[in-house]
């Protein structure tokens, strides 16, 4: 057991980590273009935050959270999603008192006790974007645009954007009555989880993926027919912005998301190539969450995107992430005196901005050059007694085999030029 990672977790080795770095760097770059700033929140929070923020009727709270009492008897939960901690930080540090909106993003591990499967682990990593303080549908459109821009820049084109409005507490109350009356006639066709949802939060039945439940909800009344004027106008405004940006979308009444805090906009971006776990991004508006968590009455909207699932989607689409380049220079050496000189020279060149590799395995000169090839080094030099005396080396271009004699002090300039 000591040599095996816990079930539902995965090591990211150097052969894969470059893909993560590429994707995460692109996420940060795009967010900066849109004016979003990074936030980092703790890996665990007080359990009450998720009970109030995510909702006690959700699968996350009922089945999936990692919750324990610490040594002081406080109930603590490992971060189960990214929005509630961001809201907590927004309130705790008084960011609501600053000029609005507040635009944040995060890349963070989250923990859920789920059945491990492709693209879904018990520890997975989430990219999220939140914008607090903006009630306009243009904010909803902006976060959708960030997600679509990222996916398209990664080369994903076989996507569906599905949108819905889940209304506000006022119009949703009316719809819940109608929906509950409809579901009452089909209770025996619902799965066990949805029978519980029927009692606690019937809207969540629409989100169920069980086929028997989907057959029932396919005939259910549409929430969009029960929206109040404010929610309907907001949804129409969102569609105008999406149309203006040229995004195709499908209005899907089943999109309600798995969290209780959503109001008005709910959306998902689905890859047609990843199978059962096709949603690569999901989000929406949560105009009551900040107040529910103890802050002022302020709106918010955002999304979450699983990085593991995104990488799986890229793989299934045959999209290859560029591998990092090899070192700028490999310095081979002959003898102990040359090794010491090589070691200090490599450090100096690294400090000045070059990627430099040397041998630590006491290989022969021939083996060192073979190792340089394996590392895909751009240039190589050999330093021995003769080179130490003359202060000159032959700089070898590893791609062409061409050699140029230069002073050791000119190595940096020669490579950079």
From Swiss-Prot:
CDD domains: HisRS-like_core, HisRS_anticodon. Pfam families: HGTP_anticodon, tRNA-synt_His. One of its GO terms (molecular function) is ATP binding. Keywords: Aminoacyl-tRNA synthetase, ATP-binding, Cytoplasm, Ligase, Nucleotide-binding, Protein biosynthesis. Its EC number is 6.1.1.21. Disulfide bonds: none annotated. InterPro entries: aa-tRNA-synth_II, aa-tRNA-synth_II/BPL/LPL, Anticodon-bd, Anticodon-bd_dom_sf, His-tRNA-ligase, HisRS-like_core, HisRS/HisZ, HisRS_anticodon. Belongs to the class-II aminoacyl-tRNA synthetase family. This is Histidine--tRNA ligase. The gene is hisS.
């Amino acid at each position: 057991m000591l040599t095996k990672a816990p079930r539902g977790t995965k090591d990211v080795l150097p052969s894969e980590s470059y893909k993560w770095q590429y994707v995460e760097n692109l996420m940060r770059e795009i967010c900066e273009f849109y004016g979003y700033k990074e936030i980092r929140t703790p890996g665990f929070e007080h359990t009450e935050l998720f009970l109030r923020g995510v909702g006690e009727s959700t699968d996350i709270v009922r089945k999936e959270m990692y919750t324990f009492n610490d040594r002081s008897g406080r109930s603590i939960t490992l971060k189960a999603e990214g929005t509630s901690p961001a809201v907590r930080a927004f309130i705790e540090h008084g960011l609501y008192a600053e000029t609005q909106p507040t635009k944040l993003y995060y890349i963070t591990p989250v923990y859920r006790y789920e059945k491990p499967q492709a693209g879904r682990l018990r520890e997975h990593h989430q990219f999220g974007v939140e914008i607090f303080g903006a009630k306009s549908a243009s904010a909803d459109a902006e976060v959708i645009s960030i997600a679509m821009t990222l996916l398209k820049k990664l080369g994903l084109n076989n996507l569906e954007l599905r949108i819905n409005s889940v209304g506000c507490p006022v119009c949703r109350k009316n719809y819940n009555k109608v929906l509950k009356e409809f579901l009452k006639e089909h209770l025996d066709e619902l799965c066990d989880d949805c029978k519980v949802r029927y009692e606690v939060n019937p809207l969540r039945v629409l989100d169920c993926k069980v086929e028997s439940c989907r057959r029932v909800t396919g005939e259910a009344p549409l929430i969009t027919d029960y929206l109040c004027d404010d929610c309907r106008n907001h949804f129409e405004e969102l569609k105008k912005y999406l149309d203006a940006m040229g995004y195709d979308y499908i209005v899907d009444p089943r999109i309600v998301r798995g969290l209780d805090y959503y109001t008005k906009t709910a959306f998902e971006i689905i890859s047609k190539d990843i199978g059962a776990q096709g949603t690569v991004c999901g989000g929406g508006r949560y105009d009551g969450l900040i107040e529910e968590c103890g802050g002022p009455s302020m709106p918010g909207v955002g999304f979450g995107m699983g990085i593991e699932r995104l990488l799986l989607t890229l793989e299934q689409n045959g999209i290859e992430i560029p591998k990092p380049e090899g070192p700028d220079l490999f310095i081979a050496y002959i003898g102990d005196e040359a090794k010491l000189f090589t070691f200090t020279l490599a450090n100096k060149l690294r400090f000045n901005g070059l990627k430099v590799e040397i041998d630590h395995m006491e290989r022969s000169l021939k083996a060192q050059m073979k190792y340089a090839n394996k590392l895909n080094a751009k240039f190589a030099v050999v330093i021995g007694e003769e080179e130490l005396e003359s202060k000159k080396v032959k700089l070898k271009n590893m791609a062409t085999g061409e050699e140029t004699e230069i002073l050791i002090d000119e190595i940096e300039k020669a490579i950079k030029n």
